[in-house]
């Protein structure tokens, strides 16, 4: 690598996101960066834990220009935990099934090249984030049934795509019971039972 790492982007790729779309979109991203002579280091791993460890190691040893995440909301969440403490800019190239974080920010879901041009040529813009139990979130914090279903869906190897969530709902709903919450909002505290509570940071 001829350039210093401070001029280099880390490109974190989840090849399995979006039913395998992540790999192809990752190739589009790296091809575009090559065409613009942008210095970058691709980072991929077999699991989210391995990817997180690799990114943490790289960012602790050197300074980088930022992180470009190619994946869905899970990868965006993972990268946030690394970028925030290091004050690193980051961008998400949508390649997941939901892409809620990208939709919340109004970023383009299809035109990757013009989006990347903005990423590498303009100054980063600050955004609001939420924090819960020392973890950062960008779009929505979900608790209760929603998070249980998401965890179950992520553990399923079949079926692929959005249908996993329908299967996960069918598996979890019969045994799920409401959770008691204590909520403080605008200075008022109250308790209630609910299937889920979601906190939105955006539209």
Where are these regions (language model features)?
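Short, active-site-adjacent cap segments at secondary-structure transitions
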Residues: 75-76, 100
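Glycine-rich beta-strand-to-loop/alpha-helix junction loops that act as flexible
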Residues: 15, 70-72, 93-95, 201
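ATP/NTP phosphate-donor binding region
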Residues: 1-67, 77, 81, 188
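Catalytic core of DAGKc-family lipid kinases
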Residues: 10-12, 36, 43-45, 84-89, ...
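Short coil/turn segments at secondary-structure boundaries
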Residues: 66-71, 88
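Short, acidic Gly/Pro/Ser/Thr-rich loop/turn segments
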Residues: 17-19, 145-148, 203
């Amino acid at each position: 690598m001829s350039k210093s790492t401070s001029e280099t982007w880390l490109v974190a790729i989840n090849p399995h996101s979006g039913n395998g779309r992540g790999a192809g979109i990752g190739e589009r991203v790296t091809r575009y960066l090559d065409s613009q002579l942008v210095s970058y280091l691709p980072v991929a791993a077999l699991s989210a834990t391995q990817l997180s460890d690799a990114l943490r190691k790289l960012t602790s040893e050197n300074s980088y220009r930022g992180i470009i995440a190619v994946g869905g909301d899970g990868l965006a969440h993972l990268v946030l935990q690394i970028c925030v403490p290091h004050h690193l800019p980051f961008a998400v190239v949508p390649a997941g099934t939901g892409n809620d974080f990208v939709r919340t920010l109004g970023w383009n879901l299809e035109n990757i090249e013009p989006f990347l041009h903005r990423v590498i040529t303009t100054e980063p813009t600050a955004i609001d984030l939420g924090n819960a139990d020392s973890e950062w979130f960008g779009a929505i914090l979900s608790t209760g049934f929603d998070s249980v279903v998401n965890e179950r869906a992520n553990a399923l190897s079949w079926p692929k795509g959005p249908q996993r969530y329908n299967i996960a709902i069918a598996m979890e709903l019969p045994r799920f019971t409401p959770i008691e919450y204590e909520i403080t909002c605008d200075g008022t505290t109250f308790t209630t039972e609910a299937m889920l509570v979601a906190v939105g940071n955006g539209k």
